Amino acid sequence: MGQNLALNLANKGWKVVVWNRTVPGKEENVVEHFIANRAKGKGIIGSNELTDFVEALKTPRVILLMVQAGPAVDELTGKLFPLMEKGDILIDGGNSYYEDTERRVKELYDKGMYFVGCGISGGEEGALHGASIMPGGAQEAWSVIQPMLKSIAAKAEDGTPCCEWVGPGGAGHYVKMVHNGIEYGDMQLIAETYFAMKHLLALKNEQMADIFEQWDKGRLHSYLIEITSAILRHKEEGGDYLLYNILDAAGQKGTGRWSVINSLQLNTPLGVIAEAVFARNLSAEKNLRVLMSKHYMHVENHPVYNYQDTVIGLESTLYAARLTGYAQGFALMCTASEQYGWKLNLSTIALLWRAGCIIRSAFLNDIAEAYHRAPGLSHLLLDEHFGREVTEALPAWKKYIGVMLREGLPVPVLSAALNYFLGLTTNRSPANMIQAMRDYFGAHTFERVDSPRGEFFHEHWEDNY
């Protein structure tokens, strides 16, 4: 990804100097190989020594780090500190944890230098041809790096670069973290829909690919829906569909988990993303699942449901569930913005995700418009447009979640989205029983419906016996 970013920058006319660490037996002659092959004729300068690398850059220097999140960032930053001067800018383009970025911003600022935590989404292709870029940190750096970053960003259909200043401190990496959390949920929702389609309709790969391709022409249009169709059609050299031969054990790098942990810290429901993380955890328990499937035999002879009704119902179910996942992610960013004082512009963030990134979707324009109309919107599903869309999808959503569960199909994220929506729209929940139990055994007190919020009571429960 670092090589592709360097090529993208060079293609846009920027002077580029590259350096890479040397790890015997693992990373040797990386720079030489890059300069002699992919970067040949691009005017990119290669350097084997960190000192030479820094000296080759004009001041104020702009240094972009593309290293693994965690200690590696601190290690490399520590080596660069003595070589940099006041006014120099250090950009971390990896998936660093936002709290680490907050610390690094302060550390460099105290030395007269500027640190930028920059979320970059789009993978290797996005890095080369245009990514969604989410910079945040030291505001003073923005005027210097703005032309450079916008030149290599993806362009939305209206020509706007998918790059804009997000906010101070760790805001850029935080928004990228939530982006990745939404991505976890989105992928699991699509996977569960494919699974339901396969079992409820007994369809072949090509038939399912046709359905996803058709959906991609409508309100579900998105990068992930597009590649789902392509994946379903992809065959190996022997003629077998590759998907059949891929082990059902999903990997993860941790950004989804970070989103869930932060949601717990901020007391903000994030069930779609949380269940998506747990679903990956469960998928990794392959040996246990094989053992349990033999111990608890499922009846595999599912009845075949009406094709047209089921396809329409699954489309509505997936649409409503995806929208709910995005709504949860934006609600988390809204809470974080208030809690951390970032003043995030949620409309702008939605616009940043319209192209280049993994979760680019047709309805991001509508999300941006919703927050533009009402910047103080407390929840996306309170928007009139999305409220109408979810209301129309609700009957099918409830029906087909019931169908899937009745047929023994595990759909934890599709059902988590529905449960969240039902809970969100329930005026009187069963939480009064929880508060009563907490007060009964622990004297934790409770509020009353006939008293102002913030006034607490305790009952001597055993006096009634």
Predicted regions and their residues:
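NAD(P)+-binding Rossmann beta1-loop-alpha1 motif at the extreme N-terminus of oxidoreductases
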Residues: M1-E55, T59-R61, L83-G87, G123-L128
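Glycine-rich adenosine-cofactor-binding loop
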Residues: M1-L5, R322, Y326-A327
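Rossmann-fold dinucleotide-binding core
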Residues: V73-G78, I91, Y97-A209, K217-Y241, ...
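Interdomain hinge/lid region at the active-site interface
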Residues: H173, H199, L203, D210, ...
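Small-residue-rich helix-loop
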Residues: Q214, S337-R373
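C-terminal amphipathic alpha-helical interaction region
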Residues: T391, A396-Y465
